[in-house]
């Protein structure tokens, strides 16, 4: 892990297209601004962990659960082109 010390207004550049700016420091909180291309996902760690856990849950559905969903949904017709 690289550890840097920055003051308000100072920046950190990552690669060619990500810039992190220290905007404000108040007590234990540091407000930062992040400039990055739209395709770069930027998430707070707690949201990232929550999404990861939800994905694990979704991927661990049992065969019995899937059978139950299909049984309860067998009247469903997928919309298609009108003929």
UniProtKB/Swiss-Prot annotation:
A translational regulator that binds mRNA to regulate translation initiation and/or mRNA stability. Usually binds in the 5'-UTR at or near the Shine-Dalgarno sequence preventing ribosome-binding, thus repressing translation. Its main target seems to be the major flagellin gene, while its function is anatagonized by FliW. InterPro entries: CsrA (IPR003751), CsrA_sf (IPR036107). The keyword RNA-binding applies. Belongs to the CsrA/RsmA family. It comes from Thermotoga neapolitana (strain ATCC 49049 / DSM 4359 / NBRC 107923 / NS-E). It comes from the Bacteria. SUPFAM superfamilies: CsrA-like. Its main location: cytoplasm. Homodimer; the beta-strands of each monomer intercalate to form a hydrophobic core, while the alpha-helices form wings that extend away from the core. One of its GO terms (cellular component) is cytosol. Pfam families: CsrA (PF02599). This is Translational regulator CsrA. It is found in: Cytoplasm.
